[in-house]
């Protein structure tokens, strides 16, 4: 009788660009403006099971640049990965999905966002490195804080 293999498994199955959009609602007029635009970057991480032992982890970025109240450009991108994760304890699984997987996916997202912005005729926006462990720990702390409803 063969014994079941209970060794932990963590494998990248695929990394892919799930969605990307670039909007320039005020072009070409805004392109003539010489002011330095403000840049707002928002990030998000989502993880969900897609099959037995298979998970999709998606890192989302929204890059919004404005001059005064007018949008120069808006980029929304979702980079995802499919990971095989088996034989992990529940607390380990959360950390892998919230830290390790986003760290693998994020460099692809950074590159794709910079490329889309540059192809749109703008200097690339270089997104900073992200400490996904700190981000995950902050989310866990916020989730553990009791909500007071008045």
From Swiss-Prot:
Disulfide bonds: none annotated. Pfam families: SecB. One of its GO terms (biological process) is protein folding. It comes from the Bacteria. Keywords: Chaperone, Cytoplasm, Protein transport, Translocation, Transport. SUPFAM superfamilies: SecB-like (SSF54611). InterPro entries: SecB (IPR003708), SecB-like_sf (IPR035958). GO terms for molecular function: unfolded protein binding. Its main location: cytoplasm. NCBIfam families: PRK05751.1-5, secB. Homotetramer, a dimer of dimers. One homotetramer interacts with 1 SecA dimer. One of the proteins required for the normal export of preproteins out of the cell cytoplasm. It is a molecular chaperone that binds to a subset of precursor proteins, maintaining them in a translocation-competent state. It also specifically binds to its receptor SecA. This is Protein-export protein SecB. It comes from Polaromonas sp. (strain JS666 / ATCC BAA-500). The gene is secB.
